[in-house]
Amino acid sequence: GMGRLKMSERPKTLTEKQAVAAVGQVALTHLYQNLFSEYNKIIAQFLLTKADFSDRNRYLNARNVSLNLLKKGIIPVVNENDAVVADEIKVGDNDTLSALVAGLIDADLLIILSDIEGLYNKNPQKYDDAKLIKLVGKIDEDIKKMAGMEGSKFGTGGMYTKIIAAEMATKIGTNLVIASGGEPENIGKII
């Protein structure tokens, strides 16, 4: 929304953030609609909130709608409904949201795209000798530290949120792959 509104600074108040998010959501959906139409695919905008995962009736409704869309060959473009949620009731990040949606639809596989190839044993932007961890058997505190937790109690995004999403997804039986989004052929290789 900031780009569409030609804003140079992030909004400060919750109401301003929500208004900008509402503008941005339309632009984002339009972009996805144009991209998927090149492949003769129909999309549906599907905005969710934390309440959709914590209230049983809302959860079942979201599940039924999602599965119905998929059955019809329609691609649900899922995002958090930032125009109506406050910070304290947010899912929080798209990695977590993707793991929740994977559970919602009983997905076999969740692919999370990143700006790097995956989890490294240390930050590859700081250390030349960083090595890609190709397979993680179990997510423990050491893995979380590798992901950027750095001994703190809270992650702020990046690889840490992807590892937390991986932990959530694998607990419900969904396989998860973290791959570079800069290489479109990765998705085909993974599938």
What are the language-model segments listed below?
Residues 185-191:
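Active-site loop ensemble at the mouth of alpha/beta enzyme cores that anchors a bound cofactor
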Residues 1-171, 175, 181-183:
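Nucleotide/pyrophosphate-binding catalytic subdomain
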